[in-house]
Amino acid sequence: MMKLFCLNIFRFLYTTSFISAVLSFNQRPINMQEVREPRLFELLAETRDCNIFSELIMQFPDYVHLFQQKDQHITVLVPNDAAFQQCKVKPWAIEYKNGVAVKSTDIVHITEQQAQDNILKFVERHIITSSPIEWNNEYKTIDGTDVHVIKKEEEIYINESIHVLCRKKASNGEMWVLNATLSTPSIRE
């Protein structure tokens, strides 16, 4: 009698779980969220080795807003943190004489406003207002710097010497992580 009772309970549970599975097959989960590509701002915020550039961007609300826009398609060239550590002259400490960046041999004395202007020029030198970028073409950044994109074998380079470490696609463009900065040409070594 006990065997029969256990067998009936097993059949009942098996049948109800089968019916439940069949009925739930056509149902959508209640909390199903639409998957979307992140925007450039989100990519920049979540990329671990690009904190310095990310902090520089945060100083300029117009560019933060640009990186959040859906309808903009831009390419941002992001030097990784190691690239900043290798800079001989930090972007905010560049001295300008007659509008031209020069490498000073003396200690540079610049005002806070000059430093902020230098950072803005630096950020603008790393933004191209088009995306996607095609190989073996030349582009202008927001500040007017010419950037030549080259693909050698499977590697991508900017101006023949700056290696693109990785490319990340966003819904509003692309983020390219670089191993060096696009420093001011007149002070490169």
UniProtKB/Swiss-Prot annotation:
GO BP term (any one): sporulation resulting in formation of a cellular spore
Cleavable signal peptide: 1-24
Compartments (UniProt record): Cytoplasm; Nucleus; Membrane
This protein's GO CC annotations: cell surface; cytosol; membrane; nucleus
Coiled-coil ranges per UniProt: none
Domain (FAS1): residue spans on this chain: 37-182
Keywords assigned by UniProt, alphabetized: Cytoplasm, Membrane, Nucleus, Signal, Sporulation
Domain of life: Eukaryota
InterPro entries associated with the record: FAS1_dom_sf (IPR036378), FAS1_domain (IPR000782), Mug57-like (IPR040200)
Xref: PROSITE patterns: FAS1 (PS50213)
Membrane topology: Peripheral membrane protein
Protein purpose: Has a role in sporulation.
Name of the molecule in the record: FAS1 domain-containing protein mug57
